[in-house]
Amino acid sequence: PLNGIIGLSRILLDDKLTEQQQNYLNTINLSAVSLGHIFSDIIDLDKIDSKRIELNIQPCDFHSLLNDFYNFGTLMAEQKGLKFSLKLDDNLPNWLYLDRARLSQILWNLISNAVKFTDKGDVILRVQKMQDNQYQFSVTDTGAGIAPCELDKIFTMYYQVKDNIHRSAGSGIGLAISKNLAQLMQGDLTVESELEKGSTFYLTIIAEKAQAHDGNAEKAMQH
């Protein structure tokens, strides 16, 4: 049902709409996408405990996926009066072999956290091709920052950063699951932060270049 809501709202957003109708549909789409990723995090709790998370690796239109990240980040940021920017390397391929849903799940967690803990300024997503088949996604904010004593704890399941201003800090599972997924993608999730200045989360993954409509490319990885 959620996929139906997401798909139909995207189709309707391409129609001629009043500004109010567009705002309503953007809210519907963003809410459905957010709810879907929250469900994915909850479902993954049991899979992580039993070490049975499956990656569904398929040819992915990488630039289409990046456009989704831009749209999502912009909608999230606008709700708090923030600016969201997407900065891309010039040498990014059009298609990659990857699990689109899982990568979206990680970036949704990182972007939504960045917006949540930032009251003014910017949130920036940078995407770079590093070496060979390695790609890096960095999410930088100008928010509250994280104390040095907490940096080694934030990827622990159920841990919540101590923040007196942003008391509704979530469930404490998103970053732990995101790091687990990053490692399944032969990468990692790390963070650099400074109190009162902001944070940058670095996601690295390994992904081979793909061709459009490669029907023989579907792969599954179980860990």
Segments predicted by a language model, with ranges:
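Helix-loop junction within the histidine kinase core
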Residues: 46-57
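Glycine-rich ATP-lid/hinge loop adjacent to the conserved G-boxes
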Residues: 159-170
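Short acidic helix/loop segment immediately C-terminal to the autophosphorylated histidine
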Residues: 13-19
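Short conserved segment of the HATPase_c
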Residues: 7, 146-158
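Glycine-rich ATP-binding loops of the HATPase_c
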Residues: 186-192
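Short alpha-helical segment of the dimerization/phosphotransfer core of two-component systems
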Residues: 30-35
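Short alpha-helical Gxxx[C/S/T] motif in the catalytic ATP-binding
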Residues: 174, 178
